[in-house]
Swiss-Prot record:
Contains 4 disulfide bonds. GO terms for cellular component: extracellular region. This is Augerpeptide hheTx2. GO terms for molecular function: toxin activity. The keyword Secreted applies. Its main location: secreted. Expressed by the venom duct. The cysteine framework is C-C-C-C-C-CCC. The lineage of its organism: Eukaryota, Metazoa, Spiralia, Lophotrochozoa, Mollusca. It comes from Hastula hectica. It is found in: Secreted. The keyword GTP-binding does not apply.
Length: 29
């Protein structure tokens, strides 16, 4: 699952990705 923002994306099983089209980051676990 993914949530917007990477400030709380600190888990080893999560990955922060940047959407180049919307210029927004998301945390995917």
């Amino acid at each position: 699952s993914c949530s917007s923002g990477c400030s709380d994306c600190n888990s080893d099983s999560c990955q922060c990705t940047l959407n180049q089209f919307t210029n927004s980051d998301s945390c995917c676990c």
